[in-house]
A protein has these predicted regions:
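Betabetaalpha-Me/HNH-type nuclease active-site subdomain
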Residues: 1-83, 156-169
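C-terminal, well-folded lobe of enzymatic/effector domains
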Residues: 79-171
């Protein structure tokens, strides 16, 4: 088993912020024009080919349920999209999920190979690579110059260019 929270540099140092606590209906700061976005989609947890890796790493170290690690508020309306200049998050974003699943597949493949030699080191490396991927996805979603498009009805443009994201994930 890999070291858990607090025992290595990759472990979480702060209390998690649950997704349900961010932009929650009925709270003072709720904005109906914004939606919570999972950088690493929850779909990964139900994808059979990743089950061994995520079982080994654990949900908490990966940060699946922590908005600070794995979340971003994105506009859900055309008006909010125009105001914020961020990708619109309304409805499913299949292409984004496909690209992330592909990147996580590369991480899992490397983890599966490396764990035959040193299981703990393989886990630490996989966590590092998943964190790098989360960081790259966040940066890319926030980059106004090279925007990712999550929704085909996004008023700010269309198209996918994941070249830079590929380079960051492979580094």
């Amino acid at each position: 088993m890999i070291p858990r929270a607090g025992s290595n540099g990759l472990a979480q140092r702060r209390a998690i912020i649950p997704f349900r606590k961010v932009n929650a209906r009925g709270t003072a700061h709720y904005d109906p024009g914004l939606q919570r976005h999972h950088l690493l989609p929850r779909q990964l947890l139900s994808t059979e080919c990743f089950s061994k890796m995520f079982e080994h790493l654990g949900r908490r170290p990966v940060g699946f349920d922590d908005f600070r690690s794995n979340g971003l508020l994105l506009p859900a309306t055309e008006a909010a999209t125009q105001r914020l200049g961020l990708p619109m998050h309304r409805g499913p974003h299949r292409r984004y999920n496909e690209v992330v699943i592909e990147r996580v597949g590369r991480i899992e493949s490397r983890w599966a190979e490396a764990r035959t030699k040193t299981e703990d080191e393989a886990g630490i490396e996989a966590l590092m690579r998943l964190r790098l991927l989360q960081t790259a996805l966040r940066r890319r979603l926030l980059d106004e110059r090279k925007r990712l498009i999550l929704n085909r009805k996004d008023p700010l443009g269309a198209g996918f260019d994941f070249t830079e994201l590929d380079a960051m994930a492979e580094a």
